A protein has these predicted regions:
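Small cysteine-rich, disulfide-bonded extracellular modules of the LU/uPAR three-finger superfamily
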Residues: 1-94, 100-136
């Protein structure tokens, strides 16, 4: 399954405006259907967020500790996996969006296929060791 990550124009604008990757509150939301539009100004602009039920809460959840490594090319990293525990019928996601707490989207992650967590199981988003995205 090919995973594709794309940056939003608003993320680049936020970075240029001294947005701090390591101290800002950043969330990840799951989508059952989603498309990428580089000019979207809100994480909810395109796509259908996973329904608020069965272990998923609208808006997703805050991601863990973040670091930024490198000098010429900077890689934005998230140190721990983000995990949801499915209840009831569980839920399915096809994409995720990272966004700043104000709702400004940073990047769109397309999993390339539906990923399902059955009730009682976990749905884990393991972040790439090399970084979620890089600039440079």
């Amino acid at each position: 399954m090919a995973v594709t990550t794309s940056m939003y124009n608003s993320a680049l604008a936020a970075l240029l405006a001294a947005f701090n990757w390591t101290s800002a509150t950043i969330y990840v939301a799951l989508f059952s259907a989603s498309t990428f539009g580089a000019t979207n100004a809100a994480y909810t602009t395109e796509g259908t967020e996973v329904v608020n039920a069965n272990g998923y809460t609208t808006g997703g959840q805050a991601v863990g500790t973040r670091t930024a490594d490198g000098t010429t090319t900077v890689a934005a990293k998230i140190s721990a996996a983000t995990v949801w525990t499915a209840t009831g019928a569980g839920f399915t996601a096809h994409a995720a969006k990272l966004y700043i707490s104000a709702g400004i989207p940073l990047c769109h992650i397309d999993f390339g296929a539906d990923v399902t967590a059955s009730g009682g199981g976990t749905w884990t988003l393991t972040w790439a060791a090399g970084g979620v995205f890089s600039i440079g």
